Amino acid sequence: MLIALWLGAHATAAATVTTIRFSLDRAIDGAAAPFVLAASKGLFRTENINVTMDSAAGSQDAIRRVAAGEADIALADINALIRYRDREDAVPVKAVFVFYDKAPYAMIARKSRGIVTMADIQGKTVGLVEGDLAMRLWPAVAKLNGIKSDKVKIEKLSPAVREPMLSAGQVDAVSGFSFLSAINLRNRGVPANDLVVLRLADFGSEVYGHALIVNPTFAANHPDAVKAFLRATIAGVKLTLKDPSKAIDDVLAKMDGASRDLELERLRASIADNIVTDEVKRNGIGGIEAKRFAAALDQIADDFEFRQRPSLADIFDEGFLPAAGARKIN
């Protein structure tokens, strides 16, 4: 009788499902496939977590949601998190998993405007969206590549006109995500052979990209649920890598009238350039190397004055990561 009661209680505890409010940094597109698959293929459910998913209006909004307790976990730019954490009133939100080992920041330019490599940016006009972190890292990249920042004319734009202005030739280049703006421009009719994507990571930028961030109260109260979310995310990444073409079908079901070819290209670009990097192949997905993090902080400091320079432990908590073997990506 007692054994039966214990077994029943144990089974009930084991089956307890934790709800997680998850926020992407923007509307779903092809690059979100690992998270979409984790939901649609039951990977979250297998981990005894019930995940609700919505979208923020950029990384700063995603961080705000997590800090305010409106979301438990979110995908956000770790560089935006670093800047946020330097605020005196910052909630101690931390990243627990790096999704983009290389940040997708890039200069997207047209060859017909005389730009084929990063050095050609000097003397040109670059369209910049207010708050775009790509340009906040520009001083460090310019210095590394011998470019005089004061010789680059900055034109401030709204997000809605970034691609149209480059398409119309009103600016020579725009800053943005490599797998967003470049593919969007092709969709606007700009010939692929006239576009050049200058990824800042290819020109010396050391910063990491997007990461999963967690509300500190939720992390303290539900550590096993956070670990379960990371395991399901890794499973979603692996399933996506196995067959990107199949994965994109699940994404398209969540979008309205999107182009299959463009979203598949977006997914493949994010995989090749940002997720499956040489560092990830060596060490597995999700972690941070202390030496590279320190170098990234140095580069951020070229355009940002820290009140107090953070330590790696201030920004990233590796305690929720699965063992390295479980994070290996083939």
What are these regions (language model features)?
Residues 15-168, 172-179, 198-200, 205-206:
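Short, glycine-/small- and polar/acidic-enriched structural segments
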Residues 99-109, 191-218, 222, 230, ...:
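Periplasmic-binding protein-like
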Residues 220-303:
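Secondary-structure end/capping motifs
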Residues 149-153, 192-195, 257-269, 306-314:
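Short, surface-exposed acidic
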Residues 40, 67-71, 86-89, 143-147, ...:
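Sec-exported extracytoplasmic/periplasmic mature domains
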Residues 1-10:
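Bacterial N-terminal signal peptides
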Residues 293-330:
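Conserved C-terminal helix/tail region of periplasmic/extracytoplasmic solute-binding proteins
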Residues 54, 93-95, 154, 240-251, ...:
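Surface-exposed patches in mature extracellular/periplasmic domains of secreted proteins
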